[in-house]
Regions:
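Conserved Rossmann-fold NAD(P)-dependent oxidoreductase catalytic core, especially the SDR/UDP-sugar
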Residues: 77, 102-136, 161
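NAD(P)H-binding glycine-rich loop region in Rossmannoid oxidoreductase-like domains
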Residues: 53-97, 128
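N-terminal Rossmann NAD(P)H-binding glycine-rich loop of SDR-like oxidoreductase domains
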Residues: 5-25
Length: 290
């Protein structure tokens, strides 16, 4: 029997790639979307697939009414709002998207689902093994995991998976992240500003992340909190220097400091048998040599 999967946050980079991957499998996707997304070209294209069903809503009571009509086996929560700003307007949106919305969906479907897959951030553990949020966004991500713990108490039938991410990258990435910024600024012949020449980051290709999701869906994976990371951190200055040796036109870069940034994030369990075989340098060369 086809697994019935509900996904939130599908308009984002991670969510859209998970949908793309899962629609190739023997599953039916229910996609929770605000009504304003109804006429988007991407959604119209997805609706041509018989295994894709959008669920449009404006108010939570509408969403509750629609979700109670369908059978769902698994929730994949990709809904997220990210900003570094902690002003009143952004705090409200951070809490609304990253805590309240996700909690409402879980409350509505708690008696139906078998698995709940959630994405967190290693920004929650920026200074060591204890909770040390880098920003308010990290606070909201951590807070929703505490909401999950509340639901675990009376819903032993649900397996919860919390996947903590550093950085993801891949095709068609429009986010204001370092990898798409390198590509965009190079093609526009603009300088790239890097916060420190000693910046080190951990990157996972989106295809490797979707493989993790498929493993959780189709295999017996122990529930829990996992870090999805590459085996090695990459020094950005070293990466750019290596690229520049292979490019006719060099990447223009300005390092804003030499501040040493330590990646001492919480030592979480690595996801079983995870291996990101993608090569970031090869990916970048392919993109900027188009």
């Amino acid at each position: 029997m086809d697994k019935k999967i509900l996904i939130t946050g599908s308009t984002g980079f991670v969510g859209s790639n998970i949908i793309r991957s899962l629609l190739k499998k023997n599953v039916h996707i229910y996609d929770v979307l605000r009504s304003k997304n109804k006429n988007k070209i991407k959604i119209k294209k997805l609706r041509r697939n018989k295994n894709y069903s959008p669920i449009f809503y404006n108010k939570f009571y509408e969403l509750q009414k629609k979700l109670k009509r369908i059978k769902i086996d698994i929730i994949i929560n990709c809904a997220t709002f990210y900003t570094k700003k902690n002003d009143i307007k952004n705090i409200e949106k951070l809490v609304q998207t990253n805590i309240i919305f996700c909690s409402v969906v879980l409350e509505i479907l708690k008696n139906k689902i078998k698995k709940f897959i959630n994405f967190g951030s290693m920004m929650e553990y920026s200074k060591g093994n204890r909770f040390s949020p880098e920003n308010f966004y990290a606070v909201t991500k951590y807070s929703f995991q505490k909401v999950e713990e509340f639901y675990k108490l009376d819903n032993k039938n649900i397996k919860f998976y919390d996947l903590k991410l550093y950085e993801t990258y891949g095709d068609n990435d429009q986010r204001k992240k370092i990898i798409p910024t390198i590509i965009k600024n190079y093609l526009l012949n603009k300088n790239i500003k890097i916060v420190s020449r000693n910046l080190e980051m951990n990157f996972v290709h989106i295809d490797s992340l979707t493989n993790v999701i498929e493993m959780i869906i189709f295999r017996k994976i122990k529930e829990g909190e996992y870090c999805i990371k590459n085996k090695k951190f990459i020094k950005i200055q070293k990466l750019i220097n290596s690229l520049n040796k292979k490019l006719l036109k060099k990447i223009k870069v300005k390092y804003l400091s030499s501040y040493k940034i330590i990646n001492s994030g919480k030592k979480l369990k690595n996801f079983p048998n995870f291996n990101d075989k993608k090569n970031l340098e090869e990916f970048l060369l392919k993109k900027i040599n188009k």
